[in-house]
């Protein structure tokens, strides 16, 4: 119950002002209040005690900074950092790399490097492997697999160690073109049939000649109208004249 003196003061218009009431309510009310139903569901699901839930609620409201793993309301980023997965410096996301069955931090692989960066890295790795000579107790790591879009070079003399393709001289390219099977290019004077090709209609194959015949017949039919005795000009009725 409210004391009589305080009740009389409130009745006479005294007591704290509106600003003081706002400050009192702001101090008593937490900033981010977690609903009780969600706290009960979380406690039932995970078996947490009310003290743990209260500590988590305080950490969310900003009153107390807690780094315990048992709190229900911890953020995903803090959990990732505690588990040992570093965050990417640009995207702030945990990036994993598999090395012998274990996940490690973000490392730039050879597939993502540019040509200028990949060349010195590959040469340094080859020099380190040659210096080790396989005495380290295990076999050296196999070379990284090629990318999906990359294909094997046609000949070993075409690709430099840095991955750049060399242009062949004109004589070698000419010989390379002569070594392939010679196919007749069907042009104006060439044909795959024994009959000479017409200069007016370039009919190279039997199928092309058939298409030209069909097209010519349609053209003749469209240019000249049908005769008057044709069935196209008669009335198409069910009865006929006697």
Swiss-Prot record:
Biased composition annotated in UniProt, kind: Low complexity: 122-139, 147-162
Region listing for Disordered, in residue ranges: 43-70, 112-162
Biased composition annotated in UniProt, kind: Polar residues: 58-70
InterPro entries: DUF5550 (IPR041009)
Pfam families membership: DUF5550
Protein name: Uncharacterized protein LINC03040
Species whose genome carries this gene: Homo sapiens (Human)
Upper lineage: Eukaryota, Metazoa, Chordata, Craniata, Vertebrata
């Amino acid at each position: 119950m409210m004391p009589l003196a305080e009740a009389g003061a409130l009745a006479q218009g005294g007591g704290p002002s509106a600003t003081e009431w706002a400050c009192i309510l702001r101090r008593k009310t937490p900033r981010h209040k977690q609903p009780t139903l969600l706290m009960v569901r979380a406690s039932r699901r995970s078996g947490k005690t009310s003290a743990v839930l209260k500590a988590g609620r305080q950490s969310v409201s900003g009153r107390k900074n807690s780094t315990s793993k048992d709190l229900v309301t911890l953020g995903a980023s803090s959990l990732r950092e505690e588990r040992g997965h570093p965050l990417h410096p640009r995207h702030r996301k945990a990036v994993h790399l598999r090395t012998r069955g274990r996940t490690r931090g973000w490392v730039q692989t050879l597939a993502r490097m540019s040509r200028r960066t990949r060349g010195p890295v590959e040469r340094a790795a080859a020099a380190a492997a040659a210096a080790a000579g396989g005495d380290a107790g295990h076999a050296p790591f196999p070379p990284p697999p090629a990318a999906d879009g990359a294909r094997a070079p046609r000949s070993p003399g075409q690709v430099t160690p840095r991955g750049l393709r060399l242009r062949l001289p004109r004589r070698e390219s000419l010989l390379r073109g002569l070594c392939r099977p010679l196919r007749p290019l069907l042009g104006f004077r060439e044909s795959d049939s024994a009959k000479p090709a017409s200069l007016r209609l370039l009919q190279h194959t039997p199928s092309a000649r058939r298409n030209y015949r069909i097209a010519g017949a349609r053209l003749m039919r469209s240019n000249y109208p049908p005769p008057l005795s044709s069935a196209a000009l008669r009335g198409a009725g069910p009865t006929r004249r006697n």
